[in-house]
């Protein structure tokens, strides 16, 4: 990490750290033993994931406890763990900077890339409040309480250093639980986004106070300069890497491995460039990079590539979290068992529990002070959500790594060894207590606040879906129950093995009961609108995979659905409202009247805008038609379904009229667009046909590879050189263009250019 004057923090190198561990070459240890600890951690992590699945105990809490148990066996008993113990000591001796550089880029990029862009934009104000003023309030609250009540005779700088160190939150357990329980997106986005931001801010605050503790005097000017450079420098580097990576992805066609490699390498290079070369916050840099990818590169990954990308990052984050929390447990055990100052002097255990109370109190102060502003920004915040937000302030790997750096940098006139040991002990204890107490009781708190209960509408949807599942099961039994070779199956035995359908057997239930009586209930209508818009968005994704729309068009369409989802409680379907400006010419097109602009450029801009409008309108109509069909199949002719379907049909009138105008004025535009879509569809169909021939064994690998390359080459040519529209006469183009509402000025432009 880089200080405010550009010097590196005095961390020990990995070689020195390992050499200072209590093991040596005499114990027959080998660097390869580090692999044993990593492998054992993953095996134990997999077992815990299976055994504790469906329980109230978060996965990360179990890993932390196991890590403490292994560390206690290795450091607290005469009988060490052999090769596994050697591996534990190697990992425990790794430089904290190296730990952050290895694990943080993966965890930060996965979290920021997986967040919903629209949710981020709406919650950004709340996230900045909690990560900016919130971290400062927490730092000074904790620092003041530590200075005034702890008996360690620390000065204000040292007390504030510990306060800033404990500012970094890591709500992995809480966020995973909220997602599992189906909590609102805004809540998970706010907690996750705040964690990402305040990790970066906390590290910057930590660096600032660390340099002060180490004797570097800084005036207010240098402090402000340092904070500004770290913040804006991180944003700039993150955006630069994001733009370069997205630009690179445009040249990679249907190569999932290469695409994933670009995202992985970009996250590590961005972190290293920011942290080591530019001296700014690597955490903020990777967070900005991930959000940029989420905003502009999500549609670059289609079909299998999209799934493979998310599966890769989920797996990478799972492995990183497993290793981080196992190692955190080992570090906590070692800090408690190997420090005589902790074990025998100062009543440090009682002060640890007191510090835990201070951490919770400071979190309450942060949320309480900022509550009026949090309620008025983004999606707002009610009192129940504020309680969960307060309780979700868990501490994790970042705080622990910073405490390790303090311990390794201690032992001098500025920072005593006892202080470094106490920092690690107190931080490790807070990490353990927040994970075990807060993490394990979050589900109970959600239950007490009744935030985990399903609404009446959702319950009816579940009951109806189970009823439809029974019908689907009966159809499947009719198709497969009687086999030519084996004979018939026993339906009662089949149904006994399908526990989800046992309660429905024999019940004559109209699946639409409950909707008629409550069809005018705003909550019911809002719920169905949300499901309808989710169906529209799913149709857009399918059209993107099929080549019916471009990446740029897909981004516009997805954004319109996100904006409409925010308004479902107060108005009817409104996703066309967000697309309407894209279908008409914006005001800045009036500058096309200038004779300075070349004739061909004017024609190209107008045709490009016209094609984009046709793509948007046709995709909108198709997606709504698909969603209406799905909703009708799902809810039948119920009043509530008819209400939402009517809203959809009303929305589509303007899009239909626009395409009719284009068909009358420039039918060749629609013909070219349809030709592109059909060509892309045929090539995709051929690709699927080749895969199917391989699947049934009619083609061998070499033959499949040859045919696949030929089809992929054609697809690449289609995307780079699609069928183009023969440019019409500029006078006809402008005067007949259905996009133009005021055509007189464009007519004069056209006539002027024609005369010229």
UniProtKB/Swiss-Prot annotation:
Cytoplasmic side: 53-56, 111-125, 179-194, 249-251, 298-311, 372-385, 444-756
Bilayer-spanning residue ranges: 32-52, 57-77, 90-110, 126-146, 158-178, 195-215, 226-248, 252-271, 277-297, 312-332, 351-371, 386-406, 423-443
Keyword DNA-binding on entry: no
Gene Ontology molecular function: any one: sodium:proton antiporter activity
Keywords: Antiport, Cell membrane, Glycoprotein, Ion transport, Membrane, Potassium, Potassium transport, Sodium, Sodium transport, Transmembrane, Transmembrane helix, Transport
Catalytic activity entry: Na(+)(in) + H(+)(out) = Na(+)(out) + H(+)(in); K(+)(in) + H(+)(out) = K(+)(out) + H(+)(in)
Annotated glycosylation sites: 27
UniProt record, GO biological process: lithium ion export across the plasma membrane; potassium ion transport
Keyword hit for Transmembrane helix: yes
Subcellular location: Cell membrane
Cellular compartments per GO CC: plasma membrane
Disulphide-bridged cysteine pairs: none
Main location: membrane
Extracellular topology ranges: 1-31, 78-89, 147-157, 216-225, 272-276, 333-350, 407-422
Pfam families membership: Na_H_Exchanger
InterPro entries for the chain: Cation/H_exchanger_CPA1, Cation/H_exchanger_TM
Membrane topology: Multi-pass membrane protein
Record-stated family: Belongs to the monovalent cation:proton antiporter 1 (CPA1) transporter (TC 2.A.36) family.
Role: May act in low affinity electroneutral exchange of protons for cations such as Na(+) or K(+) across membranes. May also exchange Li(+) and Cs(+) with a lower affinity.
Name of the featured protein: Sodium/hydrogen exchanger 8
Naturally occurring in which organism (per UniProt): Arabidopsis thaliana (Mouse-ear cress)
Gene this protein is translated from: NHX8
